[in-house]
């Protein structure tokens, strides 16, 4: 598939899966949009919630295309602003923590960093579906990321000392270990 066809196919897949999302989940998304005072307009809230869900189709298609990415073509897809700072950290050999969230195409971000030559440790959560877990771990490793499940602080410190750029997505549900913090006017975990 061409890039354009892959994006279109991803959007179609996202639209299809949107139809399968239970109405209670869609209503929950609307309530959260209203609670966060993002909009008061029902139609706008519906558009936001649908777009947020449909984009997963495009993200999924980009993961399927990881085998096509390489060091020569990655700059056609991702350009890093502030790359000189990352280069300084890489040259120091000290490693760093890259804190991100599930915004944009986080899967492509990690792949791009690895293809740009940064030693990426993608820290993720084990997926409940064993087959999907195996797939996502394998595909994340194709562009050169090292993938590990959530580990302890000592393990991350060891990886930092080894010079890894430790990627953490900070908007994940921390379970019992999280801190309650304000977000969009609400107390959240």
Stretch-by-stretch model annotation:
Residues 1-100, 134-139, 144:
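Membrane-anchoring hydrophobic helices of lipid-metabolizing enzymes
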Residues 64-189:
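Soluble catalytic domains of membrane acyltransferases
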């Amino acid at each position: 598939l061409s890039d354009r066809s892959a994006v279109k196919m991803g959007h179609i897949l996202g639209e299809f899966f949107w139809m399968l999302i239970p109405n209670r989940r869609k209503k929950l998304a609307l309530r959260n949009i209203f609670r966060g005072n993002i909009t008061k307009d029902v139609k706008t809230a519906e558009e936001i919630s649908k777009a947020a869900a449909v984009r997963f189709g495009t993200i999924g298609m980009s993961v399927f295309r990881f085998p096509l990415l390489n060091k020569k073509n990655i700059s056609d897809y991702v350009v890093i602003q502030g790359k000189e700072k990352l280069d300084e950290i890489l040259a120091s050999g000290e490693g760093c923590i890259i804190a991100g969230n599930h915004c944009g195409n986080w899967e492509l971000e990690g792949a791009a960093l690895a293809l740009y030559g940064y030693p990426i440790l993608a820290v993720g959560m084990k997926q409940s579906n064993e087959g999907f877990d195996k797939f996502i771990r394998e595909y994340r490793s194709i562009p050169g990321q090292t993938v590990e499940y959530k580990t302890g602080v000592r393990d991350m410190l060891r990886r930092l000392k080894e010079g890894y750029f430790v990627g953490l997505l900070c908007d994940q549900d921390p379970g019992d270990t999280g801190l309650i913090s304000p977000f969009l006017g609400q107390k959240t975990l």
